[in-house]
């Protein structure tokens, strides 16, 4: 990664695991927390923006959680916050632009952003300053 290139979480939004990448229902407005029943699959969608030019080939994004203000830990299939299989999308499918886009100019379509049973969304292609993508995780 080039020195001085930063990636920023622009926005997030919770949704139900009740439909496809484009049709699942939203649980709350952007950047708004929600309450989810225990042992209920849900999805969180996160927009990420790049501050500079970078080759995104094999760049891996991971999801982390923190319980009660403790340190951040990577989400796995067996952690307290864990990945969950979804019958509504394929792991590694591309996401479309569904969140507010004002913080980045170009949406990267080859993004492999839909994630369920494995960690790490792996991008391919190039990103320039102001480019971004969305990743959605089923938990």
Outline where the language-model segments fall.
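Polar, enzyme-active/binding microenvironments
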Residues: 1-139
